[in-house]
Amino acid sequence: MESSRRPLGLTKPSVDQIIKIEAEGISQSRLQLLNPTPGVWFPITPGFLALPSSKRERSFSLQKDKECLLPMESPLQSKRDIGIDTTAVLLKHLMGSRSNYCPDGIFTILAQGPMLEPVMETALKESSGLQTAKRTPIPALILSKGTQAVMRLFLLGLRPARYCLRAFMLKALEGLHLLADLVRGHNPVGQIIALEAVPTSASLPLL
């Protein structure tokens, strides 16, 4: 009758059992069973079948709270010795953790690629919100690209280079004359940009 009335659940161990557990210590397998989530702290009270507990028993002086941090186990350790290619898994693991170190001892260099920003448009973030501002391309960049194109034409021959340079200059003069007409039509008197001094095709040397 007394055995049938035993309370269900955990029973309080004796002093001898507590001393035995203190002497043996908590093994790694017990910690793995106790804490399935790695990297989480648990206060462990020995003597209660290695179950997590934050209570302290004042009746036993040998019983103390212990805190153990379980090491992070890499998901590649189980696949490392069975001949499975773990390159894709490693990349997913690195991208998920945003780290350049894997616990297996593999170091990788994560180099950031060049940012592809449009030259004509940049985004400016302010405290009031998102504001976009357009800027004109840098003249030096355009001139460098034009110079490289002309140098390639010179490698092909002098005649194609002279023809392209003359076409470029005629198009540029046409654009300047059109710009002067637009400025006269839209700007008020006194703010007209002095574009009358633009050299004409007659004053330019023939190539």
Curated annotation (Swiss-Prot):
Cellular compartment(s): Virion
Keyword Ligase applies: no
Protein name: Protein I
Main subcellular location: virion
Annotated function: Structural protein that is not essential for the viral replication either in tissue culture or in its natural host.
Gene source species: Murine coronavirus (strain 3) (MHV-3)
Pfam families found in the cross-reference section: Corona_I
Source taxonomy: Viruses, Riboviria, Orthornavirae, Pisuviricota, Pisoniviricetes
Family: Belongs to the coronavirus I protein family.
GO cellular component terms listed in the entry, alphabetical order: virion component
Keywords, ordered alphabetically: Virion
Presence of the UniProt keyword Lipid metabolism in the record: no
Extra information: The gene encoding this protein is included within the N gene (alternative ORF).
